[in-house]
């Protein structure tokens, strides 16, 4: 298991490398946006060169609004990317905490197995102690039996020597010598039994002392291991509670960040859609402005030609009917020119209304994302 965890850690890239790649992607995207903005500015400057001062001012105002909106969109995108990076870092931290928890669980399991082995060893020592006690009791009972047999033999010897065997007087000397030999042998046996009994008692006392010492040592070791196990259990419980709190806090933070990220992405999509729609509207309005300008130029040229023709025809022909017709044509051209001028003023008013709405929307967005 530790080798597999090491290989997994080696396979997963560090958070610094991930952040570096994301920063490179963000820089590339910012450069692309900067290039696109420069192209748009060049086109806008090319269009502004053929416009009047008033229209140049309006175009500059529109261009500043569009640039401000694009900057705001870039800010929102950068903040959403930062929120996404925070989420990824939190996920990495959660995975590291999970690995630490698994390692602590494995350590606790190994300690529990070690404690179980020590308890089994203690039980084996207890059974050996009981066997030694039974061996000591059996040795004591055997010693008692030997003492009883020795007393019986003494009694039999006394009964045999006390009897008067008149018909076996010839064997008295032999029995006397045999009795002496038996007595000597009995003394040797007594000394041997006493020596063996003292050795057995000393060995028994030594074994009892050693067993008591081992029992005390094992009891102390068991008590220490139990106290260590209790402290380890308390530490594991505290670590588990702390990890649970941290996981709960991380989960709440992840949920909050996900909600804010979804809101930012949705507002970003809405702003992009709105900017695209406004771009289309501006393009349409610019086309209408160009058409109106062309119509105005055509009307001005027609008015100029009509006035010239009117002057020429007024000089050439002094007829009231011709003068009325020319005057009617001049009035028609003037009316068309007035209508075109009214349409141009209405379009300017509509453009100013759109700009004011855009300023309000930008102010609301700045208030939402300070």
From Swiss-Prot:
Its main location: cytoplasm. It comes from the Eukaryota. The keyword Cytoplasm applies. Residues 36-346 form a coiled coil. Keywords: Coiled coil, Cytoplasm, Nucleus, Phosphoprotein. Expression is restricted to the adult testis, where localization is almost exclusive to round spermatids. InterPro entries: CCDC89-like (IPR043450). It is found in: Cytoplasm; Nucleus. GO terms for cellular component: cytoplasm; nucleus. Residues 1-21 are annotated as: Disordered. The modification Phosphothreonine is found at residue 12. Belongs to the CCDC89 family. Interacts with HEY1. This is Coiled-coil domain-containing protein 89. The gene is Ccdc89.
């Amino acid at each position: 298991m530790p080798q597999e965890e090491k290989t997994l850690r080696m396979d997963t890239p560090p958070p610094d490398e991930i952040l570096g790649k994301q920063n490179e992607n963000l820089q590339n995207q910012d450069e692309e946006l900067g290039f696109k903005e420069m192209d748009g500015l060049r086109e806008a400057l090319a269009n502004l060169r053929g416009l009047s001062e008033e229209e140049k001012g309006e175009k500059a105002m529109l261009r500043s609004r569009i640039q401000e909106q694009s900057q705001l969109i870039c800010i929102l995108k950068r903040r959403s990317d930062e929120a996404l990076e925070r989420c990824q870092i939190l996920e990495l931290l959660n995975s590291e905490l999970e690995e630490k928890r698994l390692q602590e669980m494995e350590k606790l399991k190994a300690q529990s197995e070690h404690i179980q082995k020590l308890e089994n060893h203690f039980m084996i020592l207890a059974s050996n102690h009981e066997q030694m006690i039974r061996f000591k009791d059996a040795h004591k009972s055997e010693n008692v039996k030997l003492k009883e047999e020795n007393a019986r033999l003494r009694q039999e010897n006394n009964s045999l020597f006390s009897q008067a065997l008149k018909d076996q007087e010839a064997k008295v000397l032999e029995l006397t010598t045999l009795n002496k030999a038996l007595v000597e042998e009995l003394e040797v046996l007594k000394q041997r039994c006493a020596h063996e009994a003292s050795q057995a008692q000393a060995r028994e006392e030594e074994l009892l002392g050693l067993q008591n010492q081992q029992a005390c040592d094992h009891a102390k070791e068991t008590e220490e291991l139990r106290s260590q196990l209790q402290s380890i259990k308390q530490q594991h419980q505290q670590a588990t509670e702390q990890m649970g709190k941290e996981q709960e806090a991380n989960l709440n933070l992840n949920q909050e960040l996900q909600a804010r990220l979804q809101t930012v992405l949705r507002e970003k999509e809405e702003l992009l859609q709105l900017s695209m729609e406004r771009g289309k509207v501006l393009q349409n309005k610019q086309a209408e402005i160009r058409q109106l300008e062309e119509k105005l130029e055509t009307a001005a040229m027609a008015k100029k030609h009509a006035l010239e023709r009117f002057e020429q025809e007024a000089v050439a022909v002094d007829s009231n009917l011709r003068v009325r017709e020319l005057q009617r044509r001049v009035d028609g051209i003037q009316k068309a020119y007035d209508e075109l001028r009214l349409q141009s003023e209405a379009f300017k008013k509509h453009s100013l209304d759109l700009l004011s709405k855009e300023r309000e929307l930008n102010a609301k967005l700045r208030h939402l994302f300070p």
